């Protein structure tokens, strides 16, 4: 199997939002970072991938199966972290362990409680008393505690302090030591992706802007630091987005080589996203 997720031309229409011909792949053995501003369509796309949105055009396969008709065996291989609490709020960690053990044949009690201890989560407090950071740590622990081959993560590090975020990213990297494992991670904390992502998929206003290998994307984009006169000399077709200042202008481009006399800096993933959105 070449791709563990294949999204082909999915279209979904809602009163104030649409996904339009969304297509991208998650190659097996890779981490794909799914980026876009709030409301761009990340969470809706993830719900479609998980078979939670039945209507609409296009097709999605997950681990070789139609996402709307996943077999119990395939569901065992998918770990999911939603952006928020996805378990009944009156449960405790101990109760959740029993519930999940009844759902997943491959549920690993020892591994689950190992993560719970690592994440310093209480065993007997109800989830409704948990902070957002605690909820995300709980969800990650559960997602990793069965025979998971594919992680689908919606804002998994949101609400976590920098130290815990770093620990979580290390856990994801450890998960990826197995070459059969794959991750699709949606996040607005794009700096996280600079540590773990192999590919970046950028969605804006319900449409895919690009899907590219991370290092290649970072290498080809440059931010030109230019005067007004230099800006006037730049071909408009070379300008992806720009920011005008009192003393200096910044232009995102993939054609910096055409302007050797203009200083150029390497952008971050966040800067690339911001400039694309500013232009559009």
What do the PLM-derived regions correspond to, one by one?
Residues 7-10, 17-27, 34, 58:
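Conserved beta-strand
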Residues 37-41:
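Walker A (P-loop) phosphate-binding loop of ABC-type ATPase nucleotide-binding domains
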Residues 50:
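Helix-to-loop junction immediately C-terminal to a conserved catalytic motif
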Residues 58-69, 73-74:
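Conserved ABC transporter NBD signature motif
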Residues 76, 80-139:
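ABC-family P-loop ATPase nucleotide-binding domains
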Residues 151-155, 160:
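Catalytic Walker B motif of ABC-type/P-loop ATPase nucleotide-binding domains
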């Amino acid at each position: 199997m070449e791709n563990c997720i294949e999204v082909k031309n999915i279209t979904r229409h809602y009163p104030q939002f649409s996904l339009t011909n969304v297509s991208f792949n998650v190659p097996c053995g890779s981490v794909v970072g799914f980026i876009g501003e709030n409301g761009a369509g990340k969470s809706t796309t993830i719900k479609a991938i998980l078979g939670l949105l039945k209507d609409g055009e296009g097709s999605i396969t997950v681990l070789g199966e139609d996402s709307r008709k996943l077999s119990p065996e395939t569901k065992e291989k998918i770990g999911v972290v939603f952006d928020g609490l996805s378990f009944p709020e009156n449960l405790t960690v101990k109760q959740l362990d029993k519930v999940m053990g009844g759902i997943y044949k491959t549920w690993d009690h020892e591994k689950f409680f190992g993560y719970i201890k690592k994440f310093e989560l209480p065993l007997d407090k109800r989830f409704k008393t948990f902070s957002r950071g605690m909820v995300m740590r709980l969800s990650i622990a559960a997602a990793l505690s069965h025979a998971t081959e594919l992680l689908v993560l919606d804002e998994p590090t949101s609400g976590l302090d920098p130290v815990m975020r770093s620990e979580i990213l290390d856990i994801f990297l450890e998960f990826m030591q197995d070459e059969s494992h794959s991750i699709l991670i949606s996040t607005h904390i794009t700096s996280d992706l600079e540590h773990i992502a192999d590919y970046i998929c950028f969605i804006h206003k319900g449409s895919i802007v690009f899907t590219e290998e991370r290092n290649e994307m970072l290498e080809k984009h440059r931010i030109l630091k230019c005067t007004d006169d230099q800006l006037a000399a730049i071909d408009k077709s070379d300008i992806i987005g720009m920011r005008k200042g009192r003393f200096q202008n910044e232009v995102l481009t993939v054609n910096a080589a055409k302007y050797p006399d203009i200083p150029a800096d390497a952008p971050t993933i966040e800067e690339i996203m911001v400039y694309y959105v500013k232009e559009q």
